[in-house]
């Protein structure tokens, strides 16, 4: 039987170079599986997108070596290019929540996944996992900036992330005042977290949306109303085992379409990356999500 051909895109920016270090092991596993491997290490997000589209026309099997954001960018480009082959994820990022869902949903299911779409003004993006406002954006921004300037601190990412949660809350950088319009109701208030997701895990392993399903045509919308720092930390700790839903500050809804209207312009994080447009980080007053 002839070897199957696979094209692999490697994102060297994932987790400060973790994908590059992990690739030799993945390459050995693929070679042992009798794959003929063509790999390419990208130089930028633009280069990654260009080669994802190019690979869509060259290969029936495409591998992505990187984190959640690498996978969702690839899915976006491959979907646009009409790719109907097999997508293989080789997880090597700082955030691998999508992998946790893949492992958890190993039971035979329909092969078609729903992609989410988020739009704000003229900017839109397809995604596999989730979009969130509030705490996740603030922590992403602080941790990313610190590790970019001091990459030697990467082994302490967990501690840095916890401190970022504390400072974000104390400085009110997590605060999002919003109206959330769902299929059948509208939620309003001050929130620390607004999450619209089709995967169960968030924030590097928290079981935040236990009923989310990317085979279903609806988002699971999870919100945490702003509360004390101690209560917020208790909620996040409880989310390890999905017990956060027992707190009155936490609400869970399902909706196929979601509109988030903000009192003041704010950024959104989509599958681990803050959404950007040609001018840089996008800050909108209204975001729409649909499947």
State where each predicted segment sits.
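ATP/NTP phosphate-donor binding region
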Residues: 1-65, 72, 77, 81
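Catalytic core of DAGKc-family lipid kinases
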Residues: 9, 40, 80-192
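Short glycine-rich anion-binding loops that position phosphate/pyrophosphate groups of nucleotides
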Residues: 14, 67-70, 76, 92-95, ...
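Short glycine-/acidic-enriched loop or helix-start segments at secondary-structure transitions
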Residues: 19, 73-76, 98-101, 205-206, ...
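Glycine-rich phosphate/pyrophosphate-binding beta-alpha loops
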Residues: 132, 136, 195-209, 274
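Short acidic/glycine-rich loop or secondary-structure boundary segments that cap or lie
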Residues: 136-139, 188-190, 202-205, 229-232
């Amino acid at each position: 039987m002839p070897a199957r051909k696979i094209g692999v895109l490697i994102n060297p920016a994932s987790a400060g170079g973790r994908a590059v270090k992990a690739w030799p092991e993945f390459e050995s596993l693929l070679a042992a599986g009798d794959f003929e491997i063509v790999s390419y290490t990208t130089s930028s997000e633009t280069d990654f997108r260009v080669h994802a589209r190019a690979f869509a026309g060259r290969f029936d099997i495409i591998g992505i070596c990187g984190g959640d954001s690498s996978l969702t960018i690839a899915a976006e480009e491959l979907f646009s290019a009409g790719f109907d082959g097999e997508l293989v994820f080789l997880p090597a990022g700082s955030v691998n929540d999508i992998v946790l869902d893949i492992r958890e949903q190993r039971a035979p299911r329909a092969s078609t996944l729903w992609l989410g779409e988020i739009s704000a003004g003229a900017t839109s993006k397809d995604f596999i996992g989730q979009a969130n406002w509030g705490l996740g954006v603030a922590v992403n921004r602080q941790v990313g900036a610190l590790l970019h300037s001091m990459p030697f601190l990467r082994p302490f990412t967990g501690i840095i992330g916890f401190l970022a949660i504390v400072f974000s809350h104390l400085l009110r950088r997590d605060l999002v005042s919003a109206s959330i319009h769902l299929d059948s109701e509208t939620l309003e208030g001050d929130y620390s977290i607004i999450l619209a997701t089709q995967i169960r895990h968030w924030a590097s392993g928290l079981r935040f949306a236990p009923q989310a399903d990317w085979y279903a045509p609806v988002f699971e919308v999870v919100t945490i109303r702003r509360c004390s720092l101690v209560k917020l930390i208790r909620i996040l700790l409880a989310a390890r085992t999905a017990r956060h839903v027992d707190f009155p500050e936490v609400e869970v809804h399902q909706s196929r379409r979601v509109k988030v209207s903000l009192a003041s312009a704010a950024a959104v994080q989509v599958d681990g990356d803050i959404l950007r447009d040609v001018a840089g980080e996008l800050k909108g007053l209204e975001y729409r999500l649909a499947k």
